[in-house]
């Protein structure tokens, strides 16, 4: 009994710490922006219909106008920009891979500086949306809104880091999950239920929701748990001539190795672009017609969304799984990939293997995006809103990832205590 208590104690403490931080983060949603008093009117009349709300929904932000409205969106944008710099400039790559802890701290510092910059940019878009709903608006109001939401976003970034380091799971992902759960009743188009006066239509819509949720659960699990394995043989096995399956090692490459990052990045970029274009006074007429048309907007959104998801699936997987690093580690362990020569051939093989796994993962993520719309067309009901589909995908993926991390932490504790 005592051993079991010692085993579970640290895990329980981490879970408790995580829950308390998430509660604290949710309380921040009720802290208004100084000087913004017409919150309820603005919220009910238009906020839920804006791209800013959708962007906030996908980044752990508030579902009302508060200091946490921007959520973690600016941080995601800054992280993406820094990762591009790491890949494009050798100096940044050296900082991340060769400078050790000091180099990583420098990368984190650059990310935080860019986060502040993106906060300021997005806060001015938010300010433009607020102008017509706030009395006595003046130039100082821009700076008040910018300071308030920038501070709120940076606090969320700090809380996410605390969860990641001292809690359970990925902090930013859990903040997004809690935000999605809190606005679950808003994920479905309001008109969907208002128009369901006929019993048969109501039953069809319930069937649609159930099938959609089950399909998302299945495809999300396949994406997170499915993997391809690279067979690895040690030098000792080669010398002894023993290569049986029982003693063979593998390097697992998950289909969804990039996790929910491709969806978060794709959603953030697309919503930021559409918001920016809509607010341009001299935007091209054809462009504005496309964005203002619901059907065309869905076609444009889905096509661009799928392309971005596929791109970021490949891009981010190659960032977190570098073929060169894997080849170096194999060399250090005196191991080789079966039937592959060490050196350049190994790097090429690993890169090809990772790209194949990423392709399958991107197809699974794309299927998750398309399934709700296909089912809605087949059953003749209104589809889930675009932001609703994305939020559900994120929620399922984050839950799967968090459960896996909890189990991994528990197994690690058991191993350490038994050794």
From Swiss-Prot:
One of its GO terms (cellular component) is chloroplast thylakoid membrane. It is found in: Plastid, Chloroplast thylakoid membrane. Keywords: Chloroplast, Membrane, Plastid, Protein transport, Thylakoid, Translocation, Transmembrane, Transmembrane helix, Transport. It comes from the Eukaryota. InterPro entries: SecY, SecY/SEC61-alpha, SecY_CS, SecY_dom_sf. The chain crosses the membrane at residues 19-39, 64-84, 113-133, 143-163, 167-189, 202-222, 255-275, 299-319, 359-379, 380-400. It is a multi-pass membrane protein. GO terms for biological process: intracellular protein transmembrane transport; protein targeting. The keyword Protein transport applies. Pfam families: SecY (PF00344). PANTHER family: SECY/SEC61-ALPHA FAMILY MEMBER (PTHR10906). The central subunit of the protein translocation channel SecYE. Consists of two halves formed by TMs 1-5 and 6-10. These two domains form a lateral gate at the front which open onto the bilayer between TMs 2 and 7, and are clamped together by SecE at the back. The channel is closed by both a pore ring composed of hydrophobic SecY resides and a short helix (helix 2A) on the extracellular side of the membrane which forms a plug. Component of the plastid Sec protein translocase complex, which is composed of at least SecY and SecE. Belongs to the SecY/SEC61-alpha family. This is Protein translocase subunit SecY. It comes from Diacronema lutheri.
